[in-house]
């Protein structure tokens, strides 16, 4: 991978703001997308026990945290050229034995959600910036 550019970081940051503009709606898009592709993922998220409920603060809080982590990864990539995952984040993913295919499902759901959040501003360049930031975060979680 080449250096993560200032433009890529700006694309991720600005589209994150579009996501934040309606977290309840986009949280539903995100988790429904995950559950459509991998219904068993419901067991990985305690707050999905009763389905996808946009009024559940744990659901919206987790979605916001995950998208913020990817945004922060973009910042780390721009500044340091690498992503360092938080030890607690690494621990929970190891404890739940999250697999490579599950990381892919989350990535696809993340991209679908951002695409919906930004509407007509979606582009290959925007998609690529989110993909790189997510992939580097996932790699940091898996290798730690």
UniProtKB/Swiss-Prot annotation:
Residue(s) carrying Nitrated tyrosine: 26, 31, 134
Location of Phosphoserine modifications: 46
Residues that hold heme b according to the record: 46, 65, 93, 96
Post-translation changes: Nitrated mainly at Tyr-31 and, to a lower extent, at Tyr-26 and Tyr-134, in effective nodules and particularly in hypoxic conditions; this mechanism may play a protective role in the symbiosis by buffering toxic peroxynitrite NO(2)(-). Nitration level decrease during nodule senescence.
Positions of modified residues (N-acetylglycine): 2
Main location (coarse class): cytoplasm
Tissue specificity: Specifically expressed in root nodules, and barely in pods.
Keyword Cytoplasm: yes
GO CC terms in record: cytosol; nucleus
SUPFAM superfamilies membership: Globin-like
Induction remarks: Negatively regulated by cobalt (Co) in a dose-dependent manner. Suppressed by exposure to excess nitrogen (N); this repression is associated with nodule greening and reduced biological nitrogen fixation (BN) efficiency.
Binding sites annotated in the UniProt record for O2: 62
Record's keyword terms, sorted: Acetylation, Cytoplasm, Heme, Iron, Metal-binding, Nitration, Nitrogen fixation, Nodulation, Nucleus, Oxygen transport, Phosphoprotein, Transport
Annotated Gene3D superfamilies: Globins (1.10.490.10)
Cell location: Cytoplasm, Cytosol; Nucleus
Domain Globin, first and last residues per copy: 3-144
InterPro entries linked to this entry: Globin, Globin-like_sf, Globin/Proto, Leghaemoglobin-like, Leghaemoglobin_Fe_BS
One function term, GO molecular function aspect: metal ion binding
Cysteine pairings via disulfide bonds: none
Matching Pfam families: Globin
GO biological process terms on file: nodulation; response to cobalt ion; response to nitrogen compound
Role of this protein: Leghemoglobin that reversibly binds oxygen O(2) through a pentacoordinated heme iron. In root nodules, facilitates the diffusion of oxygen to the bacteroids while preventing the bacterial nitrogenase from being inactivated by buffering dioxygen, nitric oxide and carbon monoxide, and promoting the formation of reactive oxygen species (ROS, e.g. H(2)O(2)). This role is essential for symbiotic nitrogen fixation (SNF).
UniProt record similarity statement: Belongs to the plant globin family.
Subunit structure of this chain's protein: Monomer.
Annotated protein name in UniProt: Leghemoglobin 2
Organism encoding this protein: Glycine max (Soybean)
